[in-house]
Swiss-Prot record:
This is Frenatin-2. Antimicrobial peptide with selective activity. Is only active against Micrococcus luteus (MIMC=50 ug/ml) and not against Bacillus cereus, Escherichia coli, Leuconostoc mesenteroides, Micrococcus luteus, Pastewella haemolytica, Staphylococcus aureus, Streptococcus faecalis and Streptococcus uberis. It comes from Nyctimystes infrafrenatus (White-lipped tree frog). It comes from the Eukaryota. The keyword Nucleus does not apply. The lineage of its organism: Eukaryota, Metazoa, Chordata, Craniata, Vertebrata.
Length: 15
């Protein structure tokens, strides 16, 4: 993802 610090789950999926 883009912001792994703010949302590891969401950003991890590419959201």
């Amino acid at each position: 993802g883009l912001l792994g610090t703010l949302g590891n789950l969401l950003n991890g999926l590419g959201l």
